Amino acid sequence: MSAPFKALVVDDAPDIRLLADLVLSMAGFSVTAAASGKEALQLLSGDDLPDIVLLDVQMPEVDGWETLTLLRGDGRTADLPVVMCTVKGLREDTLKGWSLGCDGYLGKPFDIGGLVDELHRVLARDGDQRRAHRRIRIAELARAR
């Protein structure tokens, strides 16, 4: 049996962290949680990186956009899969997320099955496939303007 995927859930809302932890743990993930982008960046500065990050956009101190930008600018985490999760479902926000380098996008409230499916979908792609998918999503959203 292979080791479970490691997920880092980053959200300032305790109920969302708890729900995501419960759902992902039941799906076989090993879950770590952070209450802010700042806390997530501290966790990600260590040697034991997760396989994927579920990242909220609206958080105090360091928001999801800034966290994603810092992750993509760091050689250690530049290719770490990141799925953005936000109540902001506006096309401009979605385009911003893809442009900054997210690998997936979930709206809140998220569908429990959809959360697990999206993380598995992103994890199934290698780095080149994720970058290609990002470019395609950006082009689709730009055309839809």
Regions found by a protein language model. Name each.
Residues 18-26:
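Charged docking surfaces used in two-component/phosphorelay signaling
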Residues 33-52:
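Acidic, metal-coordinating helix/loop segments flanking the phosphotransfer/catalytic sites
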Residues 59:
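Receiver (REC) domain active-site loop signature in two-component systems and cognate sites
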Residues 103:
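Short, glycine/charged-rich "phosphate-handling" switch motifs in NTP-dependent
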Residues 110-120, 131:
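C-terminal output helix
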Residues 124-145:
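CheY-like receiver
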